[in-house]
Every structure is written in structure tokens, then in C-alpha cells.
């Protein structure tokens, strides 16, 4: 029989949506049985009390249960006493039935909710399993390795020219197809095991849920034991024992009053039992639902987390392997162009095939051992070259594979890949193996060549030793590698990668890979991908250094590159091919340090920034208090006036006091020696049209206008229609950014001749403030993608539409509400002191806005209004007010606490928009327009 439904008033919208969901029939029946067995009333009370009452003849079902004392006349017969006592006995007897009925309704409600919860989980489970199976099907149908390789082919092709490109085009499809077959086996294996895990998920989850519900409600017993109930029953038995019914000294009226008081106590006891048990059952029900959801999440974690991690890592491993294969071909393209391919391609293929095979076997071995796909490290990829290196020598691709016949793969397997076979595709590019295009190429004398096919690296080493290959990229010296640690610095792909990096870093961006350099991100896709996949070396000091003052290009020119370039065989025979030199060598003679540095350090230039992570210099270091302008990086690092703790001092900012003060002085201050470099200089006036220069701040030594407010890290990006997109970090931000960090979206003069002195409306200051709004260190750890609330790929490469930042708004509100108490502590302890210091430091004039609620003295208290006046000491005239609005996406018609004027005596024109603290009402989506959480929850600041 269907259990009784709870009333509609007790059902929320979520419950109404859930009632169509039903779990598996087995689970539904199991839940019903568990609740019926567990929620039975304990009848011990009836067994103990009722027989005792019956011995006094008090239990008469036909007697009335409503005896009122005022209905009993004085001097009535003892029959009334008996009826009154019997009504009390019936009341006790009915308590058990009442409690059972109430708990039966409670059981029905719980049964309904638990079944609906299980049904919803079953529905979600089916949906997720379907999605998982669909994802696995797509994963099998997509050739991950081919997909990953296509994105690199174009970049690598742009690096190669002539015969090098021919060699690359000949090699790339062959090795990728071969690697696809090897890698596809691992993909199918992962998909098969993941599918089995998904199919087992439902049965395992149902069993776990039933077991959990049974364990929870096994502790649920409905008891009739109650102090008031026991007290009433005992009192009734004592009345019978003392024969008060037959005692003529006790009037019927007094006796009935006593009985009615006793019945009231019994009824209160019954209600207390029902309420207590209902409360306990509700707790158990809530706990059971939480347990069911937890079991569901745990089951999904085991299946979907593994599925997601494996799919993600399969893709990463495919990218890793594809990039390595193509990179190896690129490195070898110059050395093994067509004139040498004829002699050495067989050995080259053997080496590459062993590398691919061993890499895929390593991936599968890790999966068998750990159950997870782990992307290969550079050393694991190089194992294909060096695992059987007997003579410990190293060449461009490092090491030898075992030359024995048993280790060399069957080349027929490689050539049988359809249209990519050697015989079919080579004719489309060049002549076949019998061509005489390069008749003068000497054949290297390879010892033992008649006995076995030499590997690529061995033959290339012999070729390099005999100086028959002027195009050789480089042959490392014969040395004892001394273990895997040294491989990172002197051998194999690492040394080649170092030279490749050097060439790419010293090459103009448009000659390698297209990309803008103004964005502070990678201008070169190849370098980005190489760094992404962990090709770290001992030569990567500038990317690991704690000093932000080292320039990467300086380092490359001044580091151990000389030792590496000594091994480069330059080829100057083909002047028409820009990349005719070694693929890893610069297009010109390696420039000296002094020839490289000026170009990257010229003010206003747009030097390359690399995503390579450098450790953030602590803002607490006392060494930063006296940093000079010439010690700061020119474009990579900008000011951070970030108060991430409540006791931060003035000098603890990233930049020195002198630079901050200099940034807000006007050009007419003759005593300042650096006026001509200020952001507000007449000759350095900026406009929104100068976006590229403004965002990089390369022209301005101070890197921005210092804001006399309690700043938080935020990235401001110009969008369409003059609207700026904001990017807020997830940590080290504070609530009141909406009150104090608001930039007026004011019009900017486009004239080049606007005099800063006559800038009465403050557009120059506003413009500088807008474009340098809380500048940040782009390589700061806090701005890692994982710590940013909303980020775009290649954010600096495109103008962003205002509609794209809408999700950030809700995210910020949710983050604020979740962390309000912590933020409140920061507000109470940190704002007053820090803002007072900044006001004194920069001579901030605070208008008396909403005077009735603010008692502030000039330059002594931080402006808590939404308006702050910047008064450079040299202007003398009315300073403009920066009307700092909520954000650039706010409605323009919102009433402000103060308008754009410098009259400090002007009162609020719209008192309704002023809170008791003088601040503008904080508009939260979904809240009343006059709701301000600060007034309600936070100390006024």
C-alpha cells in the first residue's frame, strides 16, 4: 500500500520535482522494510503499567475519557470517583496507540523522502553513467595522438625550410601513425576498464545505500518512556492503592479535580514523547539522506574521478608523446635532410621506433601498476635512446639502442601503414631510394654495417666524427654521463632543446610562430608547449630564480650558451635559407650581451614575457623598502600595493616610497628630477587609443598611478565600448572592493596636447587611474590560473566583450558570503591604520560627505565615502574628484552619495542613498536595493 503522502505545505519545490524519480524496485522495498522494522513502538510501557491498573478495576473501555470536575456535584456517590479513575486509565491506555499512530505518519513521511532521495540519486547515476560511456566512446573514436600532433605540425613547419621541411614532411606522418597504433592499445585498455567500473557502479551503490540506511535506523527505537507519563501512572496507582475512591473524607469534586490534573499530565507526557521521537527521527532522516548522498559521491569519485583523470592524462600523455616525436624530427631535420636520409634513414627509423614503443610501454606499465595514466617525463621519453647505451657516448638524440637483431623492430610493421608507407609517399616528394640527386655524398664507414643495421644515433655519430655532415646540429663530447641526473644538462633531447630554445628566444616572433608580444604571455607557441610539458633543464635558472631583475635574454646570452654553441657546426653554404644553419643555433652569430640587452630594455618597448614561473619576492622583505627605479624590471613586474595582512606597514610595498610619491606629482614640480617620466607628464600623456603602451606601462618608471586606497589584487582589461573587464583572484581579496575600488568610466580626451595643469575635470588622473588600476605582478603565484576566479585563454590577445564577465559578478558575491567573517576581521583590524597611513602619505583630502554621520578631520581619517579627492600639491586649484563607481558594468543612473565636485562642504544631495557610515548602499543581486550587509554585520569603517 502506498504510504500516506505528507501535506503539500511540508513539501518544498525540490521535493515536488523529486516525486517523479523512483529508485530501483529492490531499493524501494528494502527502504520500506527497514523503516517498518525500526520504527515500531516499544510496548514495554503497556506491559508494565496497564496490568497494574487493571488490578484495581480502573480500565473500562466504555467509560468516558472527558470527566470535568465542574460536572461533579458535591456529595455525589463514589460511582463518579470510579468513572473518573477509569477515564484516567483509558487515557494511559490510549497513549500507546496515539504514539504509534503519530510515528506511523512520521514513518510514512521518512519513507517517502528517503525513496525520493534514492530515486533522484538513481536518476543522476543513470545520467552520469550514460555520459561516462559516451565519453569513453568518443575517446576510442578519436585518435588522440593524431589530434595532438596536428596542433604542433604548423608551428614546426614554420621553423623549417627547404630540405629540412621536406625531411619533416616525410617523417611526421610515418612516425605519428606508428605511434598512434601503439598508443591506441593503451586507450582501449583504459576505456575497457573504465566501462566495467561504470557498469558496476549502480549495483555497488545500491547495496551501499541500503546497508547505510539499515545501520542508521537500527538505532532508531520509539519509546513510550517519559518522566511525566511515569509520574502520572504512578500517581493513579497510588490513588487506587490508598482507596481514595472509597474514602468518604475525600469529596467527589476534589477527587475529580485531582484526576483531571493527572490526565493533563498524562497528555503532556504523550505530546512530549511524540515530539521527542519525531525530532530524533528527523535527525536520523537527515543523516540518512546525507549518507546516501555521500555514498553516491564516493561511488562517483571512484568511477568518474578515475575516468576523468585517465582521460585527461591520456590527452596530456598524447600531447607529450606527439610533441616529443615531432620535436625529435625537427632537431634532426637539419642533420638528416635528403642528402643524408638515403644512407641513415633506416637507422633513424629504428631509433625512433624503439623510442615510441618504449614510451608507450612505459605508459601502460604505469597504468598497470597504479591504475592511473601518468604523463611521461623527459627522462622516460629519452629512455628509448639511452636505455641500452653501451659506450656511454651521446649525440644529438643521445645514446644507442641495442644494435642486436633482437632489439631492432621489424621495419615491415612500420612500412605497412597504408598511405604512409615508405614506398608510396616518398615518390610524392622526391625520387625513390635509387635517386642520384646527391651523388657526391660520401658513405660513412660504419663498422659492422654488414652484420646489422646501425641505429640512427650511431650512424650519425660516425658521420659527425668524419666531418661528412656540415649540417649536423651538434655532437656532444664523448663523456661519462654519470647517471640520469647529468642527462638533464648535457645529453639527448635536453641539450638539443637548450639550443633550440636559444635560437627561438633570439629569433623574431614573426619568423617562427605568429603571436603578439604585448600581452605578457607567450609569443611563441613552441616554447609555451615545451615548457608546458615539463621540459625543464639545469639551464632554466631564469625561470626558477627568486630575483625578478634578471632578464631572460641577458641570461641566455651570458650563461653557459657558449659551451653549448661550441658544439654547433655552422652551415653558411646556403645563404638563401634562413634556417640553413643548425636548427638549434641562432640565425646569426650569437650576439654578445651588450648587443642583446638594449633592445629588450628600451622604455616603451614590448619585451617578451614568458609564462615560466618565477617565485614572488615577498612583500614583507625589508630589502624592498629602498628599491630604486633602475632596479625594477621594466615590463614584467608592476606595482603591487596589496595589503594582504592587517598589520602591513608603508614600506612593505613592492616599490619604494620615492617612486610612489613621484608617480602622483605633476610635471610642473621643478624640484623633482624625474618629472619628465611621470605618468602625468605632458609629453607622456596617455589615451585609451594607446592601449598597447598603457597596458604594458613601459613608458612609466612608476608603472602606474598609486591609489591611496586599501588595495586588493585585481586585473583590469580593456573591453569593447570602453568597458573594463575585471579579473579577481580567489584569495587575498576583500569584500569592500565594491565600495572603495570603483573606477569612473569617464570619457578620455583624445587630444595629444591636453595640459595636465588645466585638467580640471581630472580626466588625466582618472585615465591613469583606470589604466593602472591596481597593477599586479603577472608572474605572482596568486595569479596562477587555479587561483583566478574568471580567466580567458590568451586574455591579452583579444578585446573582451562586456557580456563575457557576467559570471564573475555572481561568483564574487558567493565568495564574499562564504568568507564574510574572515573578511570582517580584516576590515576591522586592518583598514583604519593602513588607510590613515596612505592618506597622510599622499595628502588625500577627504570631503565631509554625509556630515551627520561622519566626524572626520582633513587628511586624518580615511574617506569612507565612495568619493576620494586626489590633490597633487602643485596644482593649487580645485582638485578633481575621482567618482569611483561600483564597477564599469554598473548602471549609470545609480544615485551616488556625492557627485563629481571638489567642494568639501557640499552635503549629500540624496540622503536615502547614504548609509549610517556614509557609504553608498551596496547593491547585491537578489537583495532589496537598500540592503547593506555592512550596516547589519560589519563594523563601520
From Swiss-Prot:
Where does the record place Basic residues bias?
Answer: 606-626
Superkingdom of origin organism: Viruses
Q: Which Pfam families does UniProt cross-reference here?
A: HHV6-IE (PF03753)
Q: Where is this region: Disordered?
A: 1-23, 567-632
Record's compositionally biased regions (Polar residues): 567-584
Where do Basic and acidic residues bias regions lie? 14-23
UniProt xrefs under InterPro entries:
HHV6-IE (IPR005507)
Q: What is this protein called?
A: Immediate-early protein 1
Species this protein is from = Human herpesvirus 6A (strain Uganda-1102) (HHV-6 variant A)
